[in-house]
């Protein structure tokens, strides 16, 4: 009799644990969904302000695919990218590898085999994707930093990262120039510059005017 009771209690404990795990998983999935949707909303608003309507509408849609969403939910923390947590556990992020090959606003997308060196090297990003990258980085800082966000947050993140060694030198120079403008002159002037100058193909200050 006591054996049956103990067995029932153990089974009850297992059911309770399973229920709690399922509840936690569902909650993380919901929180992850809200986070990536909030991020998309900020990017979309920024893109719309500079005239990149299609890019704003389609930004990061692959994050809702099973390959990215379920891994993102599993490693969701709320204060940083789930890709970082997945990378810490496994040594790499499957979600990120899926994502970077489908989204042109990431500089990692822009790599190809160089004929001279026979090595994969970075390629300078087209300007419309450079601008979307600016919106992406700004939005990520807004979402993850919350009240601690400042116009200089994206530049600070860039300066702390190893990206400077991986990004095409000209793309890095352009990105840093824009992020410094965002920090020093604010959104209104920076967005106007992106719309009226960068996306119009006008030269950056260090470039020569086309003859």
What spans do the regions from the language model cover?
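Metal-dependent phosphohydrolase cores
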Residues: 6-211
């Amino acid at each position: 009799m006591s054996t049956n009771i103990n067995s029932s209690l153990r089974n009850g404990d297992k059911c309770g644990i399973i229920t709690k795990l399922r509840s936690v998983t569902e909650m993380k999935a919901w929180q992850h969904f809200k986070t990536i949707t909030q991020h998309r909303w900020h990017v979309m608003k920024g893109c719309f302000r500079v005239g990149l309507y299609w890019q704003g509408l389609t930004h990061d849609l692959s994050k809702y695919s099973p390959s990215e969403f379920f891994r993102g939910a599993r490693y969701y923390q709320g204060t940083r990218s789930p890709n970082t947590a997945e990378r810490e556990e496994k040594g790499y992020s499957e979600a990120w590898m899926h994502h970077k090959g489908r989204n042109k606003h990431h500089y990692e997308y822009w790599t190809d085999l160089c004929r001279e060196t026979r090595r994969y090297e970075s390629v300078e990003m087209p300007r419309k994707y450079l601008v979307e990258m600016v919106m992406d980085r700004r939005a990520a800082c807004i979402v993850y930093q919350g009240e601690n966000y400042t116009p200089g947050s994206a530049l600070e993140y860039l300066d702390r990262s190893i990206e400077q060694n991986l990004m095409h030198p000209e793309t890095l120079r352009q990105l840093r120039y824009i992020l410094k403008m965002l920090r020093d002159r604010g959104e209104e002037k920076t967005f106007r510059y992106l719309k009226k100058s960068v996306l119009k193909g006008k030269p950056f200050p260090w470039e020569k005017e086309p003859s």
